[in-house]
Amino acid sequence: MGEAEKFHYIYSCDLDINVQLKIGSLEGKREQKSYKAVLEDPMLKFSGLYQETCSDLYVTCQVFAEGKPLALPVRTSYKAFSTRWNWNEWLKLPVKYPDLPRNAQVALTIWDVYGPGKAVPVGGTTVSLFGKYGMFRQGMHDLKVWPNVEADGSEPTKTPGRTSSTLSEDQMSRLAKLTKAHRQGHMVKVDWLDRLTFREIEMINESEKRSSNFMYLMVEFRCVKCDDKEYGIVYYEKDGDESSPILTSFELVKVPDPQMSMENLVESKHHKLARSLRSGPSDHDLKPNAATRDQLNIIVSYPPTKQLTYEEQDLVWKFRYYLTNQEKALTKFLKCVNWDLPQEAKQALELLGKWKPMDVEDSLELLSSHYTNPTVRRYAVARLRQADDEDLLMYLLQLVQALKYENFDDIKNGLEPTKKDSQSSVSENVSNSGINSAEIDSSQIITSPLPSVSSPPPASKTKEVPDGENLEQDLCTFLISRACKNSTLANYLYWYVIVECEDQDTQQRDPKTHEMYLNVMRRFSQALLKGDKSVRVMRSLLAAQQTFVDRLVHLMKAVQRESGNRKKKNERLQALLGDNEKMNLSDVELIPLPLEPQVKIRGIIPETATLFKSALMPAQLFFKTEDGGKYPVIFKHGDDLRQDQLILQIISLMDKLLRKENLDLKLTPYKVLATSTKHGFMQFIQSVPVAEVLDTEGSIQNFFRKYAPSENGPNGISAEVMDTYVKSCAGYCVITYILGVGDRHLDNLLLTKTGKLFHIDFGYILGRDPKPLPPPMKLNKEMVEGMGGTQSEQYQEFRKQCYTAFLHLRRYSNLILNLFSLMVDANIPDIALEPDKTVKKVQDKFRLDLSDEEAVHYMQSLIDESVHALFAAVVEQIHKFAQYWRK
């Protein structure tokens, strides 16, 4: 083989030098802008398009692979042009040959000046660095320039310099291929003929460029020569063909970070300088400008779950004196304080007393686990003292949970000292009963007489201070002092604390919290015992309630042990209730009903007691009231009612908030009280499941026409009943959506003869649902037909009520979120699954990121989606068949 026929090459991985590229000339004409364009855009006067001579263009070059840049761009140096653009400059790219992947391409963009500090692209072109056979490009190349765009480095590129049409059709491409073949030695070289040929080729190329509508950029790739021999650069990657083993299992290698969890000295120094005492006097008179004021207003409007950035914290601290007139800003300010720094904490506490008093509902946030400073928590208690008993009752369930974040030692120190002999007798009784001191039956604390008090405790120890404008009361002391003044508060406080004392999970998982609740119950019992006659009577009534509930639990256990069907169990239930000597439940001394202490009961009517068709067979009981009436309840044994209790409390609160806004949605927030983790009471509302209504009457409207007919009303139904139905539907649709209530079917939607629709059975909340693809809210075809269909006036009213209710509840979102934040550590099933996400789930339903108008449109889309949910209708039919086969 002759020397000329040999192919000399070098691998790209062995050529450890930077890639070089020569920018030659730019051929073609730029489209001139009209005078009209100059009038519309005066900045064109500064661009090259407005110049008579060639403008001062420059070229940038950047290497891309897979749409991502491999290095920073480089650009040509400044050069003044007169008649043609000719840079004739070699650019050294910041990437080496071994670093180039097979699909590397270079993007070239030509730029023109367009006003001060601004440039616009004249055009761009892209060309791959390796040919289709893996050879690095060499020699001269005319690249087609795509006008008015930057070069595109993605794959496939939108600005190809060598398009398919130019490679196969035009004269320039054909000549370029022949030139390449000549350069590679595939043609016989004749010097005199080659000179004539190349001159003719240049003339043809010039003619083609002038006749074309495109511009062309000439670039040259470096040739590699050694000993007068030209070498081609072939793409090659060492070990590129070797297969890489895929590990099916691996071990985590933990690398210790010596600086992990250590203090960031720079941030700490900045924090201390920003919060130093020296800045205090100067910050006192600071007033924000309009932009800063708007930013502060945005920060203040954040929901309680929002974490402030360091910049936002510094801004709030800087203008803390300005914000003292805004009560809503206090919680945001307290979030900015580093309580580990004594000077900063001292400044914050001094400012706390000067701040405009916050609203009672906002103070609940200060009782969450995020605020541990005792002064801040006592400030929140001081604000709670401004709430009346009715409002306090709405928050009492959460306030009992907030005791978990109090100082347990302070609660224990509030216990009054007793005589040694009495203490020893109590300990002896406990030891003789075989019960561990940590497992004392909490009900015994209130039912057993307490030993006498030896002497008044020191002032420093007692927490039973009179209500006043001070920060002396902690949360435990406050709750006990208010409960001693109101029998209803005392009733619910007792049962809420009893449930926590008897929670076996808490006792095993967190013994300190369990002991704390026992101490709360002991202090409550002491406070009741040392009160006046009416307070001591209150204590005896609570003891009587506990005894009554214990007997009722004993009765339910006896009924459940009874063999036989439901009829036999019913007979056994009525027989045991009638045996007053054995059970003593049908005729007792007058006591408050634990479920609703305003109702005084004398016992249970035996002959009316029945068991429901259910796995746990809850009992429907009718209590004899003081005035001779009947009060129906459901007593469940073997079921934890705390989740239902929470949801009904929130529904009751929402009903109160909506009524406060003059919006009565005819809700039915029936009462639920857990008397233990295994049993409790539910108020019974005379009603019919919607599924039964549809089976017996055919439709909801037929049901209403049967019990509330009216010739003048809509569809022959009383206007008042229809209005009640529409409003209750709207209220529960919005509320169950916000609370994420799941497992909705027509058997747990109940309907009264007065038109009230309401939900029961809240075993799935916060987005949990046993059914796949549930709709956002329970609103099916039958419910809409009960209003008269989607075209009826009642349905349009329903939609309006939904919008109004949603907007009102959004304004109280902080209160609702604060209540849920206090429940994150409660042993409630659907909260315990993901306690850290509980508040976020509720917050997401409020869509606080939307304006009121956007929120209305969002609610519209939810209603439409729910009405037309096809899969939900299929699931409802499956549930209906399942219920049929169970029967």
From Swiss-Prot:
All copies of domain PI3K/PI4K catalytic, residue ranges: 605-871
GO terms for biological process, alphabetical: autophagosome assembly; autophagosome maturation; autophagy; cell division; cellular response to glucose starvation; early endosome to late endosome transport; endocytosis; endosome organization
EC numbers: 2.7.1.137
Stretches for region Activation loop: 759-780
Regions of compositional bias (Polar residues) in chain numbering: 156-170
SMART domains found in the cross-reference section: PI3K_C2, PI3Ka, PI3Kc
Modified positions (Phosphothreonine) in chain numbering: T163
Pfam family name, one: PI3K_C2
InterPro entries the record matches: ARM-type_fold, C2_domain_sf, Kinase-like_dom_sf, PI3/4_kinase_cat_dom, PI3/4_kinase_cat_sf, PI3/4_kinase_CS, PI3K-type_C2_dom, PI3K_accessory_dom
Similarity-based family: Belongs to the PI3/PI4-kinase family.
PANTHER family per the UniProt record, alphabetical: PHOSPHATIDYLINOSITOL 3-KINASE CATALYTIC SUBUNIT TYPE 3, PHOSPHATIDYLINOSITOL KINASE
Name of protein: Phosphatidylinositol 3-kinase catalytic subunit type 3
Gene name tied to this protein: PIK3C3
